[in-house]
Amino acid sequence: FDYAPEDELKVREYLHFLEGMLEKKHSQLKVVNINLLQAVVDYLAERNFIDKAIQMQKAKGDEALIKALKGPLHMDKFAPYLVSKYATNEQDIVLMTGVGSVWPLLRAHHLLNSLHSLLGHKPVVLFYPGYYDGQAMSLFGKIPSNNYYRAFRLVP
């Protein structure tokens, strides 16, 4: 679900409403909302990387930290972690938020490609602050990507 970045607060509010509505009107559906920022923090904390990351950022800056976290946050490790932690195989729908908050540590197209092989045809709704034209995503409407996606726009 792509949306204008300036509508972030409206989307968060609507998502809260949507979750309540799904729980009320479709209680048989199992829906999980994965906030990617919280997932990254939890993942790093479980591996005792938080304090090290803070120290590295203070000592060497953002670029060094981003480079150092590429290995631990590689999709071969992080995508299976999400599937396991959030029991996504037991869910009917997976909602994902926080894409803008985790950039540039995580890239949406890498995440979607990795999850596709793990989740198969399970519906994943990625709340994306930017634009998707059917072929490429543009985070915040400013950061282009020319990757192919197996996605479609939820609301044309």
Feature map (PLM): residue ranges:
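Conserved P-loop NTPase "ATPase switch" module shared by AAA+ and STAND
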Residues: 89-105
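C-terminal functional extensions of proteins
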Residues: 133-156
